[in-house]
Amino acid sequence: MSVKHTNACGTGTGASPLEAYERAWACDPTSAFGGILAFNEKVDAATARKVTGQFVEAVIAPGFAVEALKVLGKKANLRVMNMDTTGIHKASGFDVRRVMGGLLAQQWDLHRLERDR
């Protein structure tokens, strides 16, 4: 997923993190430029090489291959964050947004996506 200023710019699924990234970026590359990339699986070296060809501020994922960290580490001013997803599907809570005159609240959507569906 690509995000900029808290707005989703694109999402994608694929057989690999690279394929998912390419589909997400293709949704709206102009808006994704300078944003944040979020992955729901470990980032491999091929994905890292592709990511460093774009201008992004940060990459967050539940893990990075050693070679991917080496590749990403060479990109100036790129923030790389490892996200611990242990127990995330057992969490509960609400996403709250302010709107003029009130609040919007909805329960977190923590359903797992399956590749074959």
Indicate residue ranges for each PLM-predicted region.
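ATP-dependent carboxylate/acyl-activation modules
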Residues: 1-117
